[in-house]
Amino acid sequence: QTFQYSRGWTN
């Protein structure tokens, strides 16, 4: 998982 600014958690 990575955290993207103003988008939330994505795989």
Curated annotation (Swiss-Prot):
GO-annotated cellular components: extracellular region
Enumerate the subcellular locations listed in this protein's record, separating them with semicolons.
Secreted
Q: Which residues carry this modification: Asparagine amide?
A: 11
Q: Does the keyword RNA-binding apply?
A: no
Tell me the Gene Ontology biological-process terms attached to this UniProt entry.
Answer: neuropeptide signaling pathway
Q: Which UniProt keywords apply?
A: Amidation, Neuropeptide, Pyrrolidone carboxylic acid, Secreted
- Assign the protein's first listed, main location to one coarse class: secreted
Spell out which residues are annotated as carrying Pyrrolidone carboxylic acid: 1
Tissue localization of expression is: In larvae, both corazonin and corazonin(3-11) are expressed in the CNS but not the midgut or thoracic perisympathetic organs (tPSO) and abdominal perisympathetic organs (aPSO). Corazonin is expressed in the ring gland (at protein level). In adults, corazonin is expressed in brain, cardiaca, corpora allata and thoracic-abdominal ganglion (at protein level).
What job does the chain carry out? Cardioactive peptide. Corazonin is probably involved in the physiological regulation of the heart beat.
Q: Which family does it belong to?
A: Belongs to the corazonin family.
User: Which named protein is this?
Assistant: Corazonin
What species is this protein from?
Delia radicum (Cabbage root fly)
Its taxonomic path starts at: Eukaryota, Metazoa, Ecdysozoa, Arthropoda, Hexapoda
